[in-house]
């Protein structure tokens, strides 16, 4: 029972973090996939490919952390509005009576300093934190997933990456919202 609650909370938390990163102006998906009932686990993910990945990881005997990591990598391929490896996030884990919080948010580059966004008068330079190289941070997602896996994962790391690699290599049918986003952004 405890594992079911942990899995539900972890994946719901991952979904909430991912949903918070989504573009507010993106159109909603055309239709939601049908709900699937289970007595063993629950997965709430806004992408059917990533949901299938989570289900497969659990079926192979992986735990909630394994499923969350594999899902995160899959969403980096199939649901780029919310999932990517170029950002960061947080993971709250409760497993075997132990609670942990993994902070893998983006970090400032090594050469960053507290005045890097100020002009010679000490005023904030408009849009410098939004546009250009100085607006970027050092991504933390992969390092955070790795840290969570090392402490709480049960399957080999390679098995968690394989579904995302397969999706990227073999392709997938993108959601209409992703097609529109790519066309509007890159055409």
What are these regions (language model features)?
Residues 17-20:
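C-terminal motif of bacterial Sec signal peptides marking the signal peptidase cleavage site
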Residues 22-52, 56, 64-65, 69-187:
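Noncatalytic scaffold domains of N-terminal-nucleophile
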Residues 13-14:
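Repetitive helical segments and hydrophobic/amphipathic motifs
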Residues 1-10:
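Bacterial N-terminal signal peptides that target proteins for export
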């Amino acid at each position: 029972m405890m594992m079911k609650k942990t899995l539900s909370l972890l994946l719901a938390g991952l979904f909430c973090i991912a949903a918070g990163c989504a573009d507010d102006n993106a159109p909603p998906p055309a239709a939601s996939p049908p709900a699937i009932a289970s007595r063993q686990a629950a997965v709430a993910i806004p992408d059917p490919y990533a949901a299938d990945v989570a289900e497969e990881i659990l079926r192979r005997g992986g735990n909630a952390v394994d499923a969350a990591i594999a899902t995160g990598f899959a969403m980096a391929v199939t649901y780029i509005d919310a999932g990517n490896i170029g950002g960061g996030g947080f993971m709250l884990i409760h497993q075997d009576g132990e609670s942990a919080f993994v902070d893998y948010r983006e970090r400032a580059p090594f050469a960053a300093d507290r005045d890097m966004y100020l002009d010679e008068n000490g005023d904030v330079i408009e849009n410098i934190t939004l546009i250009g190289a100085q607006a970027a941070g050092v991504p933390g997602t992969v390092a955070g997933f790795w840290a969570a896996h090392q402490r709480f994962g049960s399957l080999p790391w390679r098995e968690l990456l394989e579904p995302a690699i397969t999706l990227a290599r073999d392709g997938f049918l993108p959601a209409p919202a992703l097609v529109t986003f790519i066309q509007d952004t890159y055409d």
